[in-house]
Amino acid sequence: MLKIGSHVSMSGKHMLLAASQEASSYGANTFMIYTGAPQNTRRKKIEDLNIEAGRAHMEENGISDIVVHAPYIINIANTTNPATFELGVEFLRSEIERTSAIGARQIVLHPGAHVGAGAETGIQKIIEGLNEVIDPNQNVQIALETMAGKGSECGRTFEELAQIIDGVTHNEHLSVCFDTCHTHDAGYDVVSDFDGVLNEFDKIVGIDRLKVLHINDSKNVRGARKDRHENIGFGEIGFDALQYIVHHDQLKDIPKILETPYVGEDKKNKKPPYRFEIEMLKNKQFDEELLEKIKQQ
């Protein structure tokens, strides 16, 4: 069964319940959340996340395998500022606790940026950080995201991800989140040779590590190393390639999460595309009028 959803908001007083209700309104059967704003460390207490009501709503609406995304401010690749590294380690630990309490089993993490020290140095620091963070008894996996290679990002190649995983002691607690936009922007040919890319991933990392898919089109040509998401079918990857990935036999049990942009000219009144994009991917039929339909909802 196709497991598809999108990024949704967990906020206000209803928190997890609000996230599940939003996902349900999109026709989704999974979703991804941040536990708070992705650009800061302000977080509600676990008892204020409205977990019981949220889980009950999920069960009633056939929603499962939800995913948490760690905030961008975590950078455990940073060797130049010890405070940034320590904050990353501490905050990632507390995010794993929240992820576990919510009932999610995957927390997606951008591996980090080496901020000029070089990829090798950054990767060693990421390994050090993950070894500090991981509790051998935790029931959550940290899903390292495939990155576009923007700036000094680590994790642009499958080899870099494999190097991180191999360096971590309790690496049974590590998985991978494959982002279609990032992988395309990093230079992999997901458009005309996705099977080749997947085989390469399997050889280098292992397909059994693949636990989350971010399904995004890209505003950029392959190899641009920019990381700018586009609506499904309206970018450089295109609908056919993305729907092939979404319905791929080897990936059928993996949650697929859309992180495509809201639509509209008015910055204050953009509309979420997810109900329309999910339906279009389920139907396997590209709709050229989609962006207009999203605006008119």
Swiss-Prot record:
Gene3D superfamilies: Divalent-metal-dependent TIM barrel enzymes. Binds 3 Zn(2+) ions. Zn(2+) 2 binds at E145, D179, H214, E259. Pfam families: AP_endonuc_2. GO terms for molecular function: deoxyribonuclease IV (phage-T4-induced) activity; DNA binding; DNA-(apurinic or apyrimidinic site) endonuclease activity; phosphoric diester hydrolase activity; zinc ion binding. Zn(2+) 3 binds at H182, D227, H229. One of its GO terms (biological process) is base-excision repair. It catalyses: Endonucleolytic cleavage to 5'-phosphooligonucleotide end-products. The keyword Lipid biosynthesis does not apply. PANTHER family: APURINIC-APYRIMIDINIC ENDONUCLEASE (PTHR21445:SF0), ENDONUCLEASE IV ENDODEOXYRIBONUCLEASE IV (PTHR21445). NCBIfam families: nfo, PRK01060.1-1. This is Probable endonuclease 4.
